[in-house]
Amino acid sequence: MKSRFLIRNTKITNSTGYRPVAWLFFMLYATVCFLACSNATDEAAQFFLKGNVQLQKREYKEAIRYYSEAITKKPDFADAYNNRGLAKFRNDDREGALADYTRALDIDPDFNTAYFNRAEARLETGDPGGSLSDLQRVEKQYRDSTFYQVRLGDTYVRLTKLSDAQSAYDRALQLKNDNVEALTNRGALYYSQKAYQPAEADIRRALQLNPKQDAALNNLSLLLAHRGNYADALTYVEQALELQPRQPYYLNNKAYLLLKLNRPSEAFPLVQESLQRDSQNAWAHQTLGLYWLGQKQSDKALTEFRIAEKLDASVDQLYYYIGMVEMAKGNRARACEAWQRGELANDDLAIKQRALQCL
């Protein structure tokens, strides 16, 4: 289930601020052990260490190159596969990261960190069930990690097990009450359940702790938009885009706000770019439908709304807009059917239109 509201993912990475301290100790221990255990593999170890330096510097292509050299020298180097997976993930190569984590686990089936990292890659490649399986595999070792609980919550959200997600985020914050990712993601969960006050409390707390948390900026923008404060909302999503200029959800959300502010010519290229980056985002298809609706091109609008429906029928107000287009095309029965489906989803606008037009 995708959303206009963004869940911020926590990653176990190399010295970037998100990785649990225990993993840092593991990596350093593994490196020292590796260096001490075999002079024959010293060259591979040197490439591995160079890769770690580049990973810390966020030079992901260079890190990948060094890790690949290490693997060439020592094909069963599980740590190098794991860290190359991290670098690939950071470089937006999800499938490549998944393959590297799996290879690390083929070499060392007890490599808990690789299970944790693969859980994220599986989640990001559309396999929340596989993600949960990996997380359960390392539950004993990581259950008292706030980062583990955030990942578990994110996975439960994708599996639409929302009460379990709530429990995981709550546990993450019990373990570390200033965990910005946990606050951001629990706030997103509250928003999805229309619990707007606790959503705002979590999001504002996250931004107090980290004013540059792009997901929290985006989510606060949408809370303000929900109240109709579109101009103020625009300033926050623009801040999010300054931090992540290519993020497709942020691009779409800015386009949506520009439509609400009657600036369609500015909105159109943004929603197009959003869909180029993620064609499976139902919210972006709805935004494009709203653009065409404003241009009085009902057929194009309906096409986009129907695509959104196939991708995620839970998109807010989707059936209200489908009904409006069908009514404009003279299809009263289809309009009433759409509004009835919106009523089942507790869409206030659909409920109102059905009462006015169909009952």
Spans of model-derived segments:
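Terminal, low-structured helical/coil segments at or just beyond the last alpha-helical repeat
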Residues: 317-359
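Canonical tetratricopeptide repeat
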Residues: 49, 83, 90, 117, ...
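Structural marker of alpha-solenoid helical repeat scaffolds
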Residues: 73, 107, 141-142, 175, ...
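Helix-start (N-cap) detector for alpha-helical repeat units in TPR-like alpha-solenoids
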Residues: 43-45, 78-79, 112-113, 145-147, ...
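Structural signature of tandem alpha-helical TPR/SEL1-like repeats
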Residues: 57-66, 91-103, 125-137, 159-171, ...
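Alpha-helical segment of the N-proximal tetratricopeptide repeat
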Residues: 42-73, 86, 90, 120, ...
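Bacterial signal peptide processing site
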Residues: 38-40
